[in-house]
Amino acid sequence: MIAHIQGRLVEKSPTDVVIDCNGVGYHLHISLHTFSLIPNSENIKLFTHLQIKEDAHTLFGFVEKSEREIFKLLLSVSGIGASIARTMLSSMEPKQILQAIATGDVVSIQSIKGIGTKTAQRVILDLKEKVLKVHDLDEVSMSSNNTNKDEALSALEVLGFNKKLAEKVVEKIARENPDATIESIIKQALKNL
């Protein structure tokens, strides 16, 4: 119904903003990710999602269209409401959420406040196929220019480890410690394989 709002930024906090658009102040709920991307300029544009309930019409704002799409995907899961979806986007980067869903990383999703094991599993079960198809992700590892990760992976293959299993372990290590050296990735992977 309302695709985006463009106007003068009147108020800004980590959870919401007010945008003056031709004399009307729109209150939008935002994630911490969006908060970190909102420029300090006077005029801004946020992509929106309007949630209509019996007792309220609530606007959610996003700097990036991709974050809005992930928000909508999360809302499609039974047991995930707007506040939990917003908490997820505040706790993890949108790319991290997609990666966790694509790789079936229940632990990462479960680490978000308000999400238990069953809900995390449901998120993965309901969204994995959509995420892999729509966002064109490889099921095991998303494309990354991390040469340390690639070299560590090839070293583990030379040592005789299963490629898919090694990829999962190396991907997890690289996600937790993006600046890890080849040696530290291999050492940690050997402990986990």
PLM segments and residue spans:
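C-terminal, charged interaction/regulatory segments at domain termini
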Residues: F161, E167-L193
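Amphipathic, charged-and-aliphatic alpha-helical interface segments
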Residues: H57-F62, A82-I101, R122-H135
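Residue-level recognition of specific faces of alpha-helices
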Residues: M1, I70-S76, A85-M88, A100, ...
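Small-residue helix-packing motif on alpha-helices
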Residues: A85, I97, A120, A166-V169, ...
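Strongly charged, low-complexity linkers/loops
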Residues: V123-I173
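Structure-specific DNA junction-binding interface
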Residues: M1-S76, T181-L193
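Conserved, well-folded catalytic cores of nucleic-acid-processing
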Residues: V77, S91, T103-G104, K130-L137, ...
